[in-house]
């Protein structure tokens, strides 16, 4: 785990608070939010979010408000400088990634290209 001074990715209060709420609903304090990148989507890469109980060797863990965000090393290289947030709007509620490395994104924001 690294401290706030050296974090290569921002985990917002809104995202951390939503993770805390969802973990509370599941009644499993071992859960962490994992963000990852996979090939696919209309722009070449897409973001994925899942809850995971384990942290693998090499994973980056960012802690905020008592909850953890976990990123694997392969995904982290595409996310450096980005922000993981949680938004509620007309399109619904969802975790989002604001990625300064993306040269283009699809309309829904779930896929990108570099």
Curated annotation (Swiss-Prot):
Gene3D superfamilies: HesB-like domain
UniProt-listed GO biological process terms: iron-sulfur cluster assembly
Coiled coil feature spans: none
Superkingdom field: Bacteria
Binding site for iron-sulfur cluster: 42, 106, 108
GO terms assigned for molecular function: 2 iron, 2 sulfur cluster binding; 4 iron, 4 sulfur cluster binding; iron ion binding
Cofactor details (free text): Binds 1 iron-sulfur cluster per subunit.
Keyword terms: Iron, Iron-sulfur, Metal-binding
Swiss-Prot/TrEMBL cofactor(s): iron-sulfur cluster
Pfam families: Fe-S_biosyn
Gene Ontology cellular component annotations, sorted alphabetically: cytosol
Known function: Required for insertion of 4Fe-4S clusters for at least IspG.
Family under the similarity heading: Belongs to the HesB/IscA family.
NCBIfam families, A to Z: iron-sulfur cluster assembly accessory protein, PRK13623.1
Protein name: Iron-sulfur cluster insertion protein ErpA
Source taxonomy: Bacteria, Pseudomonadati, Pseudomonadota, Gammaproteobacteria, Pasteurellales
């Amino acid at each position: 785990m690294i401290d706030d001074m050296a974090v290569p990715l921002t985990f917002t209060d809104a995202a951390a608070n939503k993770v805390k709420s969802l973990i509370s609903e599941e009644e499993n304090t071992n859960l962490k939010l994992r963000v990852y990148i996979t090939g696919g989507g209309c722009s070449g890469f897409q973001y994925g979010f899942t809850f995971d109980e384990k942290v693998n060797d090499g994973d980056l863990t960012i802690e905020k408000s008592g909850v953890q965000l976990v990123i694997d090393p392969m995904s982290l290289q595409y996310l450096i400088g980005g922000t993981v947030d949680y938004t509620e709007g007309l399109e619904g509620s969802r975790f989002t990634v604001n990625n300064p490395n993306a040269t283009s994104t699809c309309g829904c924001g779930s896929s990108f290209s570099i």
